């Protein structure tokens, strides 16, 4: 096997007992690859491990976990200064793995690990909210956000992405639309939103294609708003073809401003952020990510 530069895997603590992953790492080490492994325990660990990766001089920092882990690692990488910033590798080990799935990361751990180490590093965009918090995949608001943030961990562990749908159906009687105003480049809308999706990536909530036209290297955010008076039809519309749905508003812009008369919550790659005012902007070519050659989210 050809020689490859060293990598550092930042592994979500929930995945430490993954025997197939351990075997895949040991096999690649036996083939001559240098793979450092660090395990997260609390918030902030990923950023500290990225700093360590810089000191070790690795070529790739691999995020081993779900969308939240990928978010933490990628956010830490774009905050690095100087030259020789490591590329991002992705090892999908979460509940939904929305970003990894949409960009075509293999489900097989050995194949995903090899791609994360030896794949072509391509410059991709990220998004920033209120000049602070970032997301690599999607910001979602409305009832979908409340579903994903409130779904019990045991249900997610047992059922994966389907757990979000089940929990949403259980909560139908308590979920209400959010009134807000959204502005962007050549875009303005005001009304009651059942679901808001602002995507750098395409899917969220366990496989729902909220922003099916999004690309991760076009310098744009894709916006989709599901409007209407009833929650259930909106949920159903996200599970089927909705190209002709009159209750869907779409837009594209390098930034969006959102204002609401009451507090609303956005889910940023799995992390909730609440407020009344949000400025969301794209950060073009913010980091390099190792992706398959046929990645569908590249222009």
Curated annotation (Swiss-Prot):
This is Probable lipid kinase YegS. The lineage of its organism: Bacteria, Pseudomonadati, Pseudomonadota, Gammaproteobacteria, Enterobacterales. The keyword Nucleotide-binding applies. Its cofactor is Mg(2+); Ca(2+). GO terms for biological process: phospholipid biosynthetic process. Keywords: ATP-binding, Cytoplasm, Kinase, Lipid biosynthesis, Lipid metabolism, Magnesium, Metal-binding, Nucleotide-binding, Phospholipid biosynthesis, Phospholipid metabolism, Transferase. Mg(2+) binds at residues 215, 218, 220. Residues 2-133 form the DAGKc domain. It is found in: Cytoplasm. One of its GO terms (molecular function) is magnesium ion binding. It is an enzyme of class 2 (transferase). SMART domains: DAGKc. The active site is at residue 271. Its main location: cytoplasm. GO terms for cellular component: cytoplasm; plasma membrane. ATP binds at residues 40, 66-72, 95. Its EC number is 2.7.1.-. Binds 1 Mg(2+) ion per subunit. Ca(2+) may be able to substitute. Belongs to the diacylglycerol/lipid kinase family. YegS lipid kinase subfamily.
